[in-house]
């Protein structure tokens, strides 16, 4: 009489082999059976063997499982500040990259991606280089054109303001000018700023959108502007208060959040 067959559930095999990316040899060690037994159970459960690219991944990656609001924030922040690519079309890894001198920016990136994959941070001469290694469920970040964010236009306000918060965390500024709170954001992304401007007007938040430098213009010590540079301003006290109260809950960048709260306090004091 032969040895009893070792039974291993499909759910457990999928967890160890696919989710945790363990090799059949490692799974065998973990479960107290041979490499061959694990290969046989994979075949019996119709779990396909991984191709070499997938098998080479040496750290676990989790599928994106966040809300539309979180996805919207990621897209806004990505468009504003991140480089996202795959090393090859067949790669199982989406690389999210950023170069910055701001520690707060690094903290935002880590808070977004650390729970989904490996985040590598290096510091050289005051410059941070951040690389995040995600799986293909983050392919929605690869493109930077309008198709990436147009779905947000028809979303609820919570989702829209998360996108705006992500974009502002990357690009925006809240300042005090002559004792008065102001907001501005400068960007080449004309279609995004035009949409944000119209959305805010629909919410009763008057703003000003204009081109501050035309493509080809030069300023001292800079190369010519490659495209028209746009600026969106909110200067009115009441409008800026509404904007800040809606936006502050979604900001993640410590400096941006501090600036926003300081601006709101400035407005409330001036109204007394």
Predicted feature residues:
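Internal intein/HINT superfamily modules and their associated LAGLIDADG
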Residues: 2-272
């Amino acid at each position: 009489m032969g040895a009893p067959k070792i039974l291993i559930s499909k759910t457990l095999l999928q967890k160890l082999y696919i989710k945790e990316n363990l090799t059949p040899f490692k799974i065998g060690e973990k479960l107290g059976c041979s490499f061959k037994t694990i290969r046989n159970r994979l075949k019996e459960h119709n779990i396909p063997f991984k191709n070499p690219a997938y098998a080479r991944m040496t750290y676990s990656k989790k599928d994106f499982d966040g809300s539309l609001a979180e996805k919207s924030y990621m897209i806004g922040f990505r468009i504003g500040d991140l480089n996202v690519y795959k090393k090859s079309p067949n790669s199982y890894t989406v690389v999210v990259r950023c170069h910055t001198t701001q520690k707060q920016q690094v903290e935002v990136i880590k808070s977004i991606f650390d729970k989904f994959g490996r985040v590598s941070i290096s510091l050289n001469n005051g410059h941070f280089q951040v690389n995040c290694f995600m799986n293909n469920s983050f392919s929605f970040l690869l493109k930077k054109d309008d198709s990436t964010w147009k779905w947000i236009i028809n979303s609820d306000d919570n989702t829209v303001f998360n996108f705006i918060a992500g974009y502002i965390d990357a690009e925006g500024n809240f300042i005090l000018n002559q004792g008065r709170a102001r907001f501005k954001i400068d960007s080449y992304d004309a279609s995004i700023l035009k949409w944000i401007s119209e959305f805010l007007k629909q919410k009763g938040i008057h703003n000003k959108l204009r081109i501050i430098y035309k493509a080809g213009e030069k300023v001292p010590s800079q190369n010519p502007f490659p495209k028209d540079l746009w600026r969106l301003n909110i200067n009115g006290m009441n409008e800026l208060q509404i904007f800040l109260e809606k936006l502050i809950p979604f900001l993640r960048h410590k400096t941006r959040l501090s600036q926003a709260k300081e601006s709101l306090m400035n407005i409330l004091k001036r109204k007394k």
